[in-house]
């Protein structure tokens, strides 16, 4: 028997599986209070997915509101800047980059589905973020993929990593979108909890911006794209709202299945619809599917919405109404269209062989009403589903073990003394999973499709040309060191921000805005919530000091197996603009005879470093000290040095040694340097705010003058050339030996 609104009113005591759907007793009681009756099974399905952790941000939104406040403060401080065209609350942030162009970008997570089904979980993660960008009115132009895995030698890493990489590459390659950057980091805490964060960037003209709202009584609601099936019912909303025990997830809904060729048609179809001016409002169908799209569109509009659910095209005719509402089948969009434009809209869809059906209309009732074969199965206030879910002020407290962790500094660990020991240490580090060559991964991605990629892996940032006539472009970088964030989550978030900011600046771009993906353990653990709260506070304070807004992002909680949470991993993506991509600064030198300099100050900062991790298996102490004002000054210097320096490469994981290795191996041109003072500290410290640059021999004096003018410390290191990495007075490593150590780790482990 169909559970209609009338039946629900007549049978108030009907037993309902609210707990199995992830709702708590007080949440279920609140739903009954809102409706004045028990919910129908369809309404219960909608509330359960929309009030899930993944969709409602119920544990995190009390901390996230400071990012909205940050945008207001920056707007008051810089009233003429006007860079942010759309921010938090939309599908993705939109930033003005000049010349009438805007860029929209966002990073999201698809962590839990990628553990259950690595290929499809990762592939649909890419597909979902691409549709978010498309829904803003933009053409997607590139993707990136910050990834985290368990130990490289673990069986489960061998299960998930190849599938995740193939999923990211397969979907992006089929869409014709270049993958221009990302990360692949290995740590024991990610075993059983891999992180698949996906970023997409899109380009639009200012006048093409579209928002998710259902306005205009009588306007038609059109569902178009792929048919709705049983895949992904409760997918991310269920999976991302629980921890995994040793046996895997207790609730195991099917992971969404992606079809990139359908998505490619959907992109081109949607862009033509935008160009024809046929859309009053639009929303992609991602997490929570139709439940999300209908409730968010209706609550963001000025009235209500009526939907005839039996009109939805199905792949599986046996699906019940609640299953249709919960399905997370991919490659679907929902548009609000004026009645006179419906025929033209449907004609464009037919041209692209995209199925489209009018499923409802905008009303003035203030209610979201959904019928199934003429019987009402949903009648709710849309805001109560989409926006007025529970808000938890979860307890948080600095863990008792934090003091002991910070007291256990790596600076006291045994360190190499002789040149031979330094040589051996360097070779060990460059062959370690986090520092080794990642070509095994990145070679599965097309980095240059579309022909506008300017920089891609292994450069510090990805860069794409936006306008082929003016050469206007944008740069993007994603970063996070989870070990630093464990030692001090406030500082760790700021260090992630600073590194991504610096990586954008090394290419010659000016940082403008950020998106974030905050990956943490269970919010029910006060220690994890303290990490989360501190990371949010650090990110807000850092952005305030750098003068750049948070445009939006994503929170992924419950990344934890039993009592073991992942390292706190606040991934930060920074977007920058460059006026002329032909003048970008590459990350590595390509000729001999160039002078090598270090910008920034090196301090003895080894806690949380790759050296401590790889050589000693140690994690403790305080992370490196950060000076955000110095980071901003360094970025300004790098901008002024465009055309003067021939390469610029930031120092981060692995310190100066790693930067020299990557610079020398990129084009097979060696380097000879003299490291002042303590060679070990000079090579392996991970002090932030540093960049290695090269300049033609005759330009060194100009660089010295520029550094003095900006007040940035400058150290002469040596000269490029030869076929070895030479540290004067310490050791020499032929490039062939260095390359063997750097490039063989992943192929040997993964085949």
UniProtKB/Swiss-Prot annotation:
Pfam families: AIRS, AIRS_C, FGAR-AT_linker. Mg(2+) 1 binds at residues 108, 554. Pathway: Purine metabolism; IMP biosynthesis via de novo pathway; 5-amino-1-(5-phospho-D-ribosyl)imidazole from N(2)-formyl-N(1)-(5-phospho-D-ribosyl)glycinamide: step 1/2. GO terms for biological process: 'de novo' IMP biosynthetic process. Its main location: cytoplasm. It is an enzyme of class 6 (ligase). It comes from the Bacteria. Keywords: ATP-binding, Cytoplasm, Ligase, Magnesium, Metal-binding, Nucleotide-binding, Purine biosynthesis. The active site is at residues 54, 110. Its EC number is 6.3.5.3. Belongs to the FGAMS family. Monomer. Part of the FGAM synthase complex composed of 1 PurL, 1 PurQ and 2 PurS subunits. This is Phosphoribosylformylglycinamidine synthase subunit PurL. It comes from Nocardioides sp. (strain ATCC BAA-499 / JS614).
